Amino acid sequence: MDDGYWIVRCVNSGVFFTRGIERTNLTEAVLKWSRMVHGWEGAAALSQVCVDGIKGGRVCVPVLGRIVVDVCEILPCREAAVENLLNQPEWVV
């Protein structure tokens, strides 16, 4: 896959906003740069998140290099969603 921005949904690992995906098999992927999207408001489903972004929620700090082994959905992000998600504050405790 290319180095564009994507939303990756995993069965148990959660949801990730990522740039650059390397698929290793049907359900495993290496995310080159990613932020976990722990929760969101302002979008009914991930298909809306990848188009519009979110209005509120919890987006974790960026991680360089992450392997997920339970991928079930990969959605390309539109430019508006990319700008929105890149500018979400980092959720930390």
What residue spans do the PLM features occupy?
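Conserved RNA-binding domains used in RNP assembly and mRNA/RNA metabolism
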Residues: 2-93
